[in-house]
Every structure is written in C-alpha cells, then in structure tokens.
From Swiss-Prot:
Belongs to the papillomaviridae L2 protein family. InterPro entries: Late_L2 (IPR000784). A motif (Nuclear localization signal) lies at residues 1-9, 439-447. Disulfide bonds join C18-C24. Keywords: Capsid protein, Cytoplasmic inwards viral transport, Disulfide bond, DNA-binding, Host endosome, Host Golgi apparatus, Host nucleus, Host-virus interaction, Late protein, Microtubular inwards viral transport, Phosphoprotein, Viral penetration into host nucleus, Virion, Virus entry into host cell. It is found in: Virion; Host nucleus; Host early endosome; Host Golgi apparatus. This is Minor capsid protein L2. It comes from Human papillomavirus type 61. It comes from the Viruses. The keyword Phosphoprotein applies. Minor protein of the capsid that localizes along the inner surface of the virion, within the central cavities beneath the L1 pentamers. Plays a role in capsid stabilization through interaction with the major capsid protein L1. Once the virion enters the host cell, L2 escorts the genomic DNA into the nucleus by promoting escape from the endosomal compartments and traffic through the host Golgi network.
Length: 459
C-alpha cells in the first residue's frame, strides 16, 4: 500500500524552530535570509549597473522613495511649513527709579455728587399754619355753549382684520359720551362646528383589571373551546355562592372576582363536579341556544409534580337561568283569497229542475281541480249547477224561423286528438341486438348495439 506523502512545513516555520538548534535544511536558511543564488546575482550586478530610483530589484516595485517620474521631469519637492511667527511684544524698560507698585486706575479729580445737607440756624423751630375750606370743588366739564358735530369714518381691510370681529368704531363726542353705535358691520363668514367628546378611559370595574389593549379589544372568552370541559350545573347556588360547592368552609370573597381555593391533600367536595378545582374565574353572562347562561371558567389541579407545578384541565361551568322565547310573527298571505273552490255537476239535478221521469239522466259528478287559487284553509263547497242537454231544449218552428236540425249538444268530455305527438311502444324495447351477432360467443366488451332508428328499418 502506497503511503501518502505529507507536505513539509513552510520555510518560515522551519526557520523559527531549527535556527537556534542548527538543524535547518540547507535550502531554508538562504531562502529566509535572502542569500540564495538569485539574490547574490542581483547584488553583484548592482555594483556595476545603476538603475536610478526605479527600484528594480528585490524591492516592493513602487519606484523607490520618490516613486515613478515621467521622463524629462523632476520629482516634486516637499516644502516644509513651519510654525507661524508672532509679532514681538514691546516691553517698556523699567529703571531703578521707577516705583514697584503699579496703579490700576489713573489719577483723576474727585467728583462729589448729590444734594447738599441743609443747615439750620436758630432754635425757634418751624411755624405750621392750618386752614379749612367748606365749599366743595366742582368742575364743570360740559362745554359752555355751541353744538358739537362728530363724524367718524372707518376703512375695513379684510386682509388685516379677522371677519368675526369686524366692527366700526363707535362715535362719541369730545367729552366721552357715546352718541350712536352699531353692533356689527356685514355678515360673518364662519361656520360653527360642534365639538365631539372622544372616548375617555374609565376606571377599572374590578380589583384585577385586564391590561389596556385587552380591555378595549374585548377578547373572546372561548368558553366553548375544545380545550375546555363542558359541565352543566343545575344547582342555582352556583350563581350566588359557588364556594359552597367546592369547600365546606365559607371564605370571604367577592362573587365578581376570581376565587382561589387551597385544598388539603385528600378531600371530598360537596359537589363531585367540582373535584380538584383550585380557581374559579369571574362570571360571564352569555346567550346561547335560546337561553341566558351564567358561565365561569375553572382550573383543575389533578396532578402535582415534584417541583410543585400543578397540571389540570380547564372546565367551563354553566347554569341556564331562563329561556328566551322566540317572537311569534303571524304571517299573512301575499295574494288575497278569491272565491272558494267549487265543484260543478255537468248534468242537471232532476230534483232542482223538476223534470218528468222520462227525461231524467243519471247524475255524473266530476270533481276536477279548483278553478281559483286559494289558501289551504279555505273551505270547499259543492254546488250543483243545472245544465240542460239538447233533449231539455224545446224546439219549435214558426213562420220566420225554421229549425230543420237541432243544435248538437256540447260534449262533456274534453276533445282528445286522434294522433299523438310522441312515439308509443307496445310490447317492445328501446334497442335491438344486431342479428349477425346472435350466434357469436359472448363478449363483455365491444358488442355493438343498434337502436331503433333508420338503420334498423333499412337492415
């Protein structure tokens, strides 16, 4: 079996490990240190040939430090920009006779402002003189005479004035008394829009309200889901005191809230339908199958794991409060009923006609379909109508009328045509077997049949 040749490590990896111990292969050290035969030829050739700044050799091929320069041009020079020099600050020379204290404010003359303090001479004090006037001071503001004419002019610019407050200035006299005024000028060009109150949030109706989004969306209760066990409770105590059906004690609870029960390990509830119930959710009123239904969702704790987790099914307990009867609507016929159905006798009744015995005919009653469309509740009446035949009609001849032949009586039976529009088969079938295939062996497939058409008649 041929062994697979392993690839040797790179020269760089071998050089790192074998350089210190001196066990490197003969081709590793010259390759890493650049001392191969090709490198030596380039070194020897560079001594006699100068390639300038082209960088031809074992370099990176970037054209040297200055890069590649077109023929006939010079490489660009780099101008070094030094720091910007600041102008010198002139410093005043300080001599030995100058003071060492520098004054911040120059000397100036002192200016005194303010009123002078009065000086009093003598010791007599002040003389106070008091006087009183009994006549009130009344000023007459009414003009002495002459009529006052007041005129006003207003210029309204709708571009700078709001339409709802366009009012002319009120006219008044010089004394301030109003003479005339107008309430408004022109008609208002605005529309009153009634304000609507948006939906406001109401306080929660219970101590454990649902979150905001779920409360507004009104989620479905899913009482009749396949995951819920349906149990009907016939005891009406389920609506007022459901805890009495689960435990014997009487805990203080709110019937509108969720009830949580703590049971011992072994116990028997008063109602066996509420076995292993640990919680009853808030009640709900629904209408289903024509009744008002009181429902509560319960949670069972049938199993309990070692970690303390309880496992059980959800149960829907419901109690039907009262039925909802359907409204009875009396239906009226759309088409008014006409005359009742009447059955007529074709031949006359001898008792009604009171004819001689030799001309009496046997009475034939033909009950056909009703002559009018009536409702099913209409009462059927049988009425005999006297109809005379040709024998009952007296025929006499006179000077002006000649009855050579008596008129033929109207037949009682409807006229039936002698020919029929459809074909009638008497003791026949709807197809015939071709006689040529009678003596052939029977086959289940490919047996031609010829129907009773022109082909059979011609054959």
């Amino acid at each position: 079996m041929a062994l697979k040749r392993r690839k040797r490590a790179s020269a760089t990896d071998l050089y790192r490990t074998c350089k210190q111990s001196g066990t490197c292969p003969p081709d590793v050290v010259p390759k890493v240190e650049g001392d191969t035969l090709a490198d030596r030829i380039l070194k020897w050739a560079s001594l006699g040939v100068f390639f300038g700044g082209l960088g031809i050799g074992t370099g990176s091929g970037t054209g040297g430090r200055t890069g590649y320069v077109p023929i006939g041009t010079r490489p660009p020079t780099v101008v070094d920009i030094g720091p910007v020099s600041r102008p010198p600050v002139v410093i005043d020379p300080v001599g030995a006779a100058d003071p060492s204290i520098v004054t911040l404010v120059e000397e100036s003359s002192v200016i005194e402002a303010g009123a002078t303090v009065p000086t009093f001479s003598g010791s007599g004090g002040f003389n106070v003189t008091s006087s009183s006037t009994t006549t009130p001071a009344v000023l007459d503001i009414t003009p002495s005479g002459g009529s006052v004419q007041v005129s006003s002019t207003s210029f309204i610019n709708p571009l700078f004035t709001e339409p709802s407050i366009i009012e002319p200035p009120q006219a008044g006299d010089l004394a301030g008394h109003v003479i005339s005024s107008t309430p408004t000028a022109g008609s208002h060009s605005f529309e009153e829009i009634p304000m609507h109150t948006f939906a406001t949030s109401e306080g929660p109706g219970s101590s454990t309200p649902l979150p905001g989004i779920r409360r507004l969306a009104r989620p479905r209760l899913n009482l009749y889901s396949k995951a819920n066990q349906q149990i009907k409770v016939a005891n009406p105590t389920f609506m007022s005191d459901p805890a009495s059906l689960i435990t014997y004690d009487n805990p203080i609870f709110d019937p509108e809230e969720t009830i949580i029960f703590e049971h011992p390990s072994i116990y028997t509830p008063p109602d066996p339908d509420f076995l292993d119930i640990v919680s009853l959710h808030r009640p709900a009123l629904t209408s289903r199958q024509g009744t008002v239904r009181f429902s509560r969702l319960g949670q069972r704790a049938t199993l309990r794991t070692r970690s303390g987790r309880r496992i059980g099914a959800r149960v829907h307990f419901y109690h039907d409060i009262s039925p909802i009867p359907s409204d009875a609507v009396e239906l009226q016929p759309l088409v008014p009923s006409s005359s009742p159905s009447i059955t007529y006798d074709i031949y006359a009744d001898p008792e009604v006609l009171d004819l001689p015995a030799q001309h009496t005919q046997p009475t034939l009653t033909v009950q056909g379909p009703s002559l009018s469309a009536a409702s099913a509740s209409t009462k059927v009446h049988n009425v005999t109508v006297p109809l005379a035949t040709g024998l009952d009609t007296p025929v006499t001849s006179g000077p002006d009328v000649d009855f050579a032949h008596a008129p033929a009586p109207v037949p009682a039976v409807p006229y039936v045509p002698a020919t029929h529009p459809h074909s009638i088969y008497i003791q026949g079938s709807d197809f015939y077997l071709l006689p040529a295939y009678v003596f052939f062996p029977k086959r289940r497939k490919r047996v031609p049949y010829s129907f009773s058409d022109g082909f059979v008649a011609a054959w």
